[in-house]
């Protein structure tokens, strides 16, 4: 699957159970990759003051030919001077410093006759961003060190601001998470861990499966996410779990429309059947563990919405399985839907 670089807003359903209800105060915030959410990595570079601004164009051309910086196209070669005295108007980025950074003269850095150093002052070391910024916050941090180009992903910016989803879409999201909360409450009534999950086809807003934690000594792997994936499979004529002792765990049979769409949008597994959850959304009250996150990768889920984080969570807290570049499927993750309510269900995960 092609990696997901941004977040596409989808229209809300025509009708949802709570369409007259004002959504509670919560935000669906994206869980981005480590590259998108981490601090800006800096490397040392050499720069030099441009003492004669009439030489700027020539120096830029000659230095760029010798040190083209193909791995750092985001770095601008010239910046306004930050010298308090104002003795010169700009600084020119020469080259990366490498592991043996130290004081260097122009003669050591700029080979002649390829570069005529007239017009340049004494070189100095400066930290510069090693990679292009991926979010606006990274851009603001990066340009504080050195001028940097930035190609903003408006969808990511909207998602980080909590503005990606319309009021109608938020109402639908709240309805589905409330359903997961009720499933978690049913689990607690059976003496099970209070974690609930719901799988939804976002194209129709149709609930395909509702499940909760069903773990026991005999079946320790039946986490809510694993249960829901199996229930979706049962709706497709597959699945293997016997959940008759848990009436809150239910599924609906795949419709002809869903089956037809599956054939057009889903790749096939080794049995020539479509992957179980391609194109579907999962709502779960607690952040999934590593096992469940990998199951979602294999099931080809499209998006995951979770309420409260987990100490060993694999979709943001401990790991970001959904965004690993070495996996053959990645998916979008949002956190914070009805977070307080979800946290109260299972206060000591």
UniProtKB/Swiss-Prot annotation:
Names of the cofactor(s): Zn(2+)
Annotated Gene3D superfamilies: Cytidine Deaminase, domain 2 (3.40.140.10)
Family: Belongs to the cytidine and deoxycytidylate deaminase family. ADAT3 subfamily.
The name this protein goes by in its record: Probable inactive tRNA-specific adenosine deaminase-like protein 3
Sequence ranges assigned to domain CMP/dCMP-type deaminase in this UniProt record: 171-334
Pfam family, one: dCMP_cyt_deam_1
Region annotated Disordered, chain positions: 1-25
CDD domains reported in the protein's UniProt record: nucleoside_deaminase
InterPro entries: CMP_dCMP_dom (IPR002125), Cytidine_deaminase-like (IPR016193)
Lipid metabolism found in the keyword field: no
Organism: Rattus norvegicus (Rat)
N-acetylmethionine modifications at: 1
GO terms for MF: catalytic activity; metal ion binding
Binding site for Zn(2+): 223, 289, 292
UniProt GO BP: tRNA processing
Superkingdom: Eukaryota
GO cellular component: cytoplasm; nucleus
Alphabetic keyword roster: Acetylation, Metal-binding, tRNA processing, Zinc
